[in-house]
């Protein structure tokens, strides 16, 4: 069985291919099939993931999997949320993980409530018209550190501390 991954992120493909292979599923990047990147016009993770999955299914005729994820900071009213990937650009920074972390930490200066959640929503559709998309959401709640810690991880990993894990 072939499923298209509605993402142009090579890191996501590298993580997911080994998970699907034992199931006899060949996961193919949408870019390998000429699928244009989908817009993400919605204000929720689930709506954006669904539109991306349907876009990939429409262009390929294959089942599709998509995700949308971001950082939701309590003291910032849930922001940056669905705008996480581009959050730093509103402050004049280039779009990079480093600059996104920098922008969030700058906005959090002086805040005592540092609770935040990394949220990820994954949607799978069997076809573009699938009336029952499979939707899964997860969240990891942590405290934002005041500066990056450690040498591993990507995205917001270096500024997230989970007290129960030390």
Task: Name each model-derived stretch.
Residues 1-4, 10-166:
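Anionic-ligand binding patches
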């Amino acid at each position: 069985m072939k499923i298209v991954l509605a993402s142009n992120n090579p890191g996501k493909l590298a993580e997911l291919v080994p998970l699907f292979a034992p199931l006899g599923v060949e996961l193919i990047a949408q870019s390998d099939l000429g699928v244009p990147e989908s817009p993400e016009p919605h204000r929720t993770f689930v709506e954006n993931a669904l539109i991306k999955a349907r876009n990939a299914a429409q262009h390929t005729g294959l089942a599709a999997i998509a995700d949308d994820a971001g950082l939701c900071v309590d003291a910032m009213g849930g922001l940056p949320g669905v705008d996480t990937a581009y959050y730093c650009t509103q402050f004049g920074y280039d779009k990079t993980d480093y600059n996104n972390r920098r922008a969030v930490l700058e906005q959090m200066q002086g805040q005592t409530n540092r609770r935040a959640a990394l949220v990820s929503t994954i949607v799978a559709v069997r076809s573009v018209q699938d009336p029952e998309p499979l939707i899964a959401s997860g969240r990891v709640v942590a405290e934002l550190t005041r500066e990056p810690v450690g040498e591993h991880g990507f995205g917001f990993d270096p500024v997230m501390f989970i007290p129960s894990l030390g």
